[in-house]
Design a protein with these regions (language model features):
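Active-site-proximal loop/turn and secondary-structure-junction residues that shape catalytic pockets
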Residues: 199, 258-260
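Flexible loop residues that form catalytic
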Residues: 157, 257, 331
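Sec-dependent signal peptide recognition
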Residues: 2-8
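C-terminal motif of bacterial Sec signal peptides marking the signal peptidase cleavage site
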Residues: 13-16
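C-terminal "post-core" interaction segments
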Residues: 225, 230, 238-239, 244, ...
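Flexible, low-complexity junctional segments that flank or bridge functional domains
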Residues: 18-251, 276, 447-475
């Protein structure tokens, strides 16, 4: 077997994995990679082609090598190989730096540390405000005192408009001015402050809490990326849920509206922590992976078992055990590993989706780099499809999973996570106990709904919203 590729296969939805008890064993590297002798673009492209031919899920749909534009720059050549790029294959990508690619997949980014939505500031639909959805822990934004629900009104002294809102936060250091909001009017505070982007590790648990609601103990978890380095932190949250007031929580609301994926092993862990009656399921099928025909043959030859194709439930002491249902808050930002949790739970319990449709990514990847370090780029092509224990995987469309309860996240200002008056969480509580919700609603003043400019990722969100599912794959 030629030692030409370093393949990290992190079953992320994003899938990234660490060597823990839940790590999926990496499939072996195929031996069909052509060894190039030069560092020219053409040689790099031959390497890319052979790697894609060996591992790409749609390898059978690729053009012949001789018919490709072999002299293109590698970053351009890669995308010419994709099957139905941006329609069928909406997900494969390449970075000129494998280091940058790996850092992104592991939640290490240089950012302000905010996710935000753009809303029109007035009826002219010319001026724009950024409403902060969340602030990363340990970020420059948190240090500056920014929080969910704040409105960014000016940047570097300029009003945010439909002409500049997609690029106005690109500089490394920025002067930001917030706005107060009252009676449908935004008013600048007149107190700008400076903030500089920093490189930080995403801490994926934004909020976990338990509230008492109509005689029930309701657990709430907002989780924004599946990072295996935080698996023990996730277990700790569920241990708190399980032991709350001795008998544990009665209902779980899992907020994945901002979770674009991550490590498959971490997605599998979350599934195991939630699923009802885990002990009876240990050793049975949770999910399966489907590869291209050629790579399937390689894996079958490598192992006599289904270890590369089937993921079974594993024992987890923090499993909640008794829940008959789970409420999952979703949006178009709910993707890949997040959708994997939804799909894997559906055969075993009632999964109630609240919000908007999910992204629609039922496929994953592993990272391909040149182990001889002739080229520094990293490839992240789609290499497998996932199905659940019932062989279901029918959410791989632009509509993803449709919600059971459609809710728009456009009530401003955004309320804190875990607050009963917060739009998504409040809807879940209204289903848990409609009577209690109606009684409390009499005390809650209605808030206006804003008109969103679009739902495209902006600024930090472009970086933090990478939607992936991968498995770690090393030779």
């Amino acid at each position: 077997m030629k030692n030409l590729l370093y393949i990290s296969a992190l079953i992320l939805v994003l899938f990234a994995c660490k060597k823990t008890e839940v790590t999926t064993k990496a499939p072996p590297v195929s031996s069909n990679i052509t060894e190039a002798s030069t560092t020219s673009d053409s040689a790099a492209n031959v390497f890319i082609y052979d790697a894609m031919k060996g591992y790409y899920l749609w390898a059978d749909q690729m053009p012949s090598l001789s018919s490709t534009a072999i002299k293109l720059k590698p970053i351009n050549y890669f995308y010419t190989l994709l099957y139905g790029y941006d329609t069928i294959d909406r997900f494969s990508w390449m970075d000129t730096s494998a280091t940058n690619l790996t850092n992104q997949l592991n939640g290490i980014n240089t950012v302000l540390g905010i996710k935000y939505s753009a809303f029109f500031a007035d009826n002219t639909q010319t001026n724009v405000v950024f409403s902060i959805s969340y602030v990363l822990k340990g970020s420059a934004a948190e240090a500056a005192g920014l929080k969910r629900g704040d409105f960014i009104y000016k940047v570097d002294g300029k009003q945010i408009t439909v002409s500049n809102y997609q690029s106005i936060l690109q500089n490394q250091t920025l002067s930001i001015e917030l706005a107060n909001y009252a009676n449908g009017v935004y008013t600048a505070t007149g107190k700008p402050f400076s903030i500089t982007k920093t490189t930080l590790q995403t801490i994926p648990i934004l909020k976990d809490t338990v509230i008492e609601w109509a005689g029930k103990k309701v657990g709430y978890l907002n989780y924004i990326q599946f990072l295996n380095s935080f698996d023990d932190s996730l277990r700790a949250v569920f241990n708190r849920f399980k032991s709350y007031k001795n008998s544990g929580i009665d209902e779980l609301v899992l907020d994945l509206r901002y979770n674009g994926g991550g490590y498959v092993v971490s997605s599998d862990l979350l599934t195991s922590l939630i699923v009802k009656d885990l002990p009876s399921k240990v050793g049975t099928v949770m999910s399966k992976k489907v590869y291209n025909n050629a790579y399937t043959a390689v894996l079958r030859k490598e192992a006599n078992s289904d270890q590369y194709f089937i993921t079974n439930f594993k024992s987890e002491s923090a499993n909640l055990g008794k829940l008959n249902r789970v409420f999952i808050l979703t949006s178009p930002g709910t993707a890949s590993a997040s959708e994997l949790v939804i799909n894997n739970l559906k055969p075993f319990m009632d999964v109630i989706l609240i919000g908007e449709h999910t992204f629609g990514k039922n496929v994953g990847s592993f990272t391909i780099t040149d182990s001889k370090k002739r080229w520094s780029f990293g490839l992240q092509p789609i290499t497998f499809k996932t199905v659940n224990a019932r062989d279901e995987s029918n959410y791989g469309t632009v509509n993803g999973f449709l919600p059971d309860y459609l809710v728009k996240d456009n009530v401003i200002p955004f309320k804190p996570f875990g607050d009963p008056t917060e739009t998504y969480f409040g809807k879940a509580l209204s289903i848990i106990s409609p009577v209690a919700y109606k009684a409390n609603a009499l005390e809650w003043r209605p808030t206006p709904r804003a008109t969103q400019v679009n739902n495209l990722p902006l600024g930090d969100s472009r970086i933090m919203d990478r939607k992936e599912m991968w498995i770690e794959h090393k030779n």
